[in-house]
Every structure is written in C-alpha cells, then in structure tokens.
Amino acid sequence: MPKAPAKKAEPAPAPAPAPEPAPAPAAPAVDLSAVKVEFSADQIEDYREAFGLFDRVGDNKVAYNQIADIMRALGQNPTNKEVSKLLGNPSADDMTNKRVEFEAFLPMLQTIINSPNKAGFEDYVEGLRVFDKEGNGTVMGAELRIVLSTLGEKMTEAEIDALMAGQEDENGVVNYEAFVKHIMSV
C-alpha cells in the first residue's frame, strides 16, 4: 500500500501583536498657585508696562502665544517647552485663543526667573566651540544657520536672518563669542 503523504505541520500561529506603548505623559503643568512672587513694586510696574505693550485687545490680557515673547522682552530666555508647561501644555488652538491676565503672568515669570536650568554665556560659547574646526574662535555662518534651523527649537529662515544680521564677515565667518554676546543682548 502506498504511504499517505505526511501531513505538513501547521505553522504556529503568529504571536499576538505587542500592545501599543502608552503615550508618554505630558509634562505636568506647574502649580502656579504655589509660586511666591518676589518682585519689588518697581519691577512689577515695569513688568506691567511690558505686558501692556502686548495687549492687542485692550482687556489687560495677552494670548498664550505671547507669553514667551513678553518674557524674552523682559530679559528672560525660556524655551517654548518651558512656557508650554507653565501654561498647562495647551493645544495650538488654545495658544492662539486663550488669554492670560497680568496677575496670572507674574507667577509664570517668577518661575522662569527662578529656574535653575538657565544657560549662560559660557554654556553657549562651549556649544558653538564644537563647530570651531580651526580653533580660532570662529564658525562658518552657513554651518551656524544649519544648526539654528535644525537643532533644538528650530528657527525659521526669517528669524535666523534677523539674528545673523551683521554677524558674518566678508568670508561668511562668525566670531562666536561676539555672536553669543549679540544674541544675549537682543
């Protein structure tokens, strides 16, 4: 009798797909009610004046998306991520449409001023020194433009042009210590 062909073994069933990883939790919002505002009356008046310059509606409030600009106008340099965290990680729509009054702005400003993560002159110079191939205190302007447009908080071409205006010599080279002094004074 001819042998019946051996039955092929069924392939093992595919394993169940791994569960989707949980999305990373958004950075928790800062409890601004716990922030002690430590500004002098003169400072508060200066801050109120700067805040008022950004009030385009006349209701003594500014849009969420103006908070970082006001802080920068007051000499601080918060990242967009830091400001977003202060605002409770709002949506893009909220950034445009929600508004903040001056009294709510003060604890935000105090938080940024008290932040231990501030980079100083030497930190920025050290970061740019990596691109100083000659060891002579300069970097190529074109390379600096690429860095500004691709790393960290990416800048637009218009922002880079404004920042770099007058910084490159006739050979397209930038003295990075002078550049850092320039950007820290803007």
From Swiss-Prot:
This is Myosin light chain 1, skeletal muscle isoform. Keywords: Motor protein, Muscle protein, Myosin, Repeat. The modification Blocked amino end (Met) is found at M1. Residues 42-77, 119-154 form the EF-hand domain. GO terms for molecular function: calcium ion binding. InterPro entries: CALM/Myosin/TropC-like, EF-hand-dom_pair, EF_hand_dom. The keyword Repeat applies. Myosin is a hexamer of 2 heavy chains and 4 light chains. In fish, myosin MLC1 and MLC3 appear to be produced by two different genes unlike in birds and mammals, where they are produced from a single gene by alternative splicing. SUPFAM superfamilies: EF-hand (SSF47473). One of its GO terms (cellular component) is contractile muscle fiber. The lineage of its organism: Eukaryota, Metazoa, Chordata, Craniata, Vertebrata. It comes from Chelon ramada (Thin-lipped grey mullet). Residues 12-26 have a biased composition (Pro residues). Residues 1-26 are annotated as: Disordered.
